[in-house]
Amino acid sequence: MVVDDSAVVRQVLVGVLNDAPGIDVIATAADPLLAIEKMRQHWPDVIVLDVEMPRMDGITFLRKIMSERPTPVVICSTLTEKGARVTMDALAAGAVAVVTKPRLGLKQFLTDSADELVATVRSAARANVKRLAARVTAAPLEAEVKHTADIILPAQSGRALAQTTERIVAIGTSTGGTQALEEVLTALPRVCPGIVIVQHMPEKFTAAFAARLNGLCQIAVKEAANNDRVMPGRALIAPGGKHLLLRRSGAQYFVEVLEGPPVNRHRPSVDVLFRSAARAAGSNALGIIMTGMGDDGAAGLLEMRQAGARTVAQDEHTSIVFGMPKEAIKRGGADRILPLGAMAREIVTQLQ
């Protein structure tokens, strides 16, 4: 079901989704109250939802859905500061993913973002609904060519390990990751290793996400800027639309934020971060791959393990989408498989 107050946007979204094999839009609605009437007749598997609508706002509607019958919800939001803030509230309320809303001149959306919408809806349809409900009560395909991390950080022969004792943590996640990261980071004490994070998310949304977490956590959380130092008690989140690399200067770590083609169809890419962590930190790193669709991060986690790092994959039971962790486990990249609730404790042990 598509719920949006713009008839033009509804028409475009429905056209894109109905053209995709295996997807059938059973209904549309101009506001949540109309949506509720239609859902009583036929409940959808996935809802694509605008968050700013008349009569009932999208957040209230989302909370109603999650309390009555948890259902995967994809937020379709505008690329504005206000839209980003509201979208963060929606993700906290149980939405599984966010896509950017098409603008009125819809050619660019049809060219650049249709595949992302379809992939996100398919990913949402596979979401662990029971886990979604438990959370509430308690990324983008950008290119046809699938690049590897080699295009950003070419593979090396031999191993160049870090000569430093400072510990760092690298985390990669996608669908369901905003809720997972909130659960992990809010459980951390002020004294913990420096953390670098890739969460698949459109540009302009990561700053609002980082600001929200910063207000909830004991540690500091910010959107990464080029040359930011990785410090104990602080987490840096890759900005949407940019790659994030870990670098080292002497005994200190810092990050590089750079442009470049999508890797595994994502920018930022988890593989890029993990490969850079393997090179910069070696055995002083902990790599964690969590809920998400696809295989981004699977190759990079294996590289981290081969460089001597401890590596962890989230288990299937607590993952919203058991795609990225499953692929990492399959390739031998994870030396441990842990539930989400054990991740914070695992991070703290990096200090020991």
From Swiss-Prot:
<feature type="modified residue" description="4-aspartylphosphate">
    <location>
        <position position="50"/>
    </location>
</feature>
<comment type="similarity">
    <text>Belongs to the CheB family.</text>
</comment>
<feature type="active site">
    <location>
        <position position="174"/>
    </location>
</feature>
<dbReference type="InterPro" id="IPR011006">
    <property type="entry name" value="CheY-like_superfamily"/>
</dbReference>
<dbReference type="GO" id="GO:0005737">
    <property type="term" value="C:cytoplasm"/>
</dbReference>
<dbReference type="GO" id="GO:0006935">
    <property type="term" value="P:chemotaxis"/>
</dbReference>
<dbReference type="GO" id="GO:0000156">
    <property type="term" value="F:phosphorelay response regulator activity"/>
</dbReference>
<keyword id="KW-0145">Chemotaxis</keyword>
<dbReference type="GO" id="GO:0008984">
    <property type="term" value="F:protein-glutamate methylesterase activity"/>
</dbReference>
<dbReference type="InterPro" id="IPR008248">
    <property type="entry name" value="CheB-like"/>
</dbReference>
<dbReference type="InterPro" id="IPR000673">
    <property type="entry name" value="Sig_transdc_resp-reg_Me-estase"/>
</dbReference>
<protein>
    <recommendedName>
        <fullName>Protein-glutamate methylesterase/protein-glutamine glutaminase 2</fullName>
        <ecNumber>3.1.1.61</ecNumber>
        <ecNumber>3.5.1.44</ecNumber>
    </recommendedName>
</protein>
<feature type="domain" description="Response regulatory">
    <location>
        <begin position="1"/>
        <end position="116"/>
    </location>
</feature>
<feature type="active site">
    <location>
        <position position="296"/>
    </location>
</feature>
<keyword id="KW-0597">Phosphoprotein</keyword>
<dbReference type="InterPro" id="IPR001789">
    <property type="entry name" value="Sig_transdc_resp-reg_receiver"/>
</dbReference>
<keyword id="KW-0378">Hydrolase</keyword>
<feature type="domain" description="CheB-type methylesterase">
    <location>
        <begin position="162"/>
        <end position="352"/>
    </location>
</feature>
<keyword id="KW-0963">Cytoplasm</keyword>
<dbReference type="Pfam" id="PF01339">
    <property type="entry name" value="CheB_methylest"/>
</dbReference>
<dbReference type="Pfam" id="PF00072">
    <property type="entry name" value="Response_reg"/>
</dbReference>
<dbReference type="GO" id="GO:0050568">
    <property type="term" value="F:protein-glutamine glutaminase activity"/>
</dbReference>
<feature type="active site">
    <location>
        <position position="200"/>
    </location>
</feature>
<dbReference type="InterPro" id="IPR035909">
    <property type="entry name" value="CheB_C"/>
</dbReference>
<comment type="function">
    <text>Involved in chemotaxis. Part of a chemotaxis signal transduction system that modulates chemotaxis in response to various stimuli. Catalyzes the demethylation of specific methylglutamate residues introduced into the chemoreceptors (methyl-accepting chemotaxis proteins or MCP) by CheR. Also mediates the irreversible deamidation of specific glutamine residues to glutamic acid.</text>
</comment>
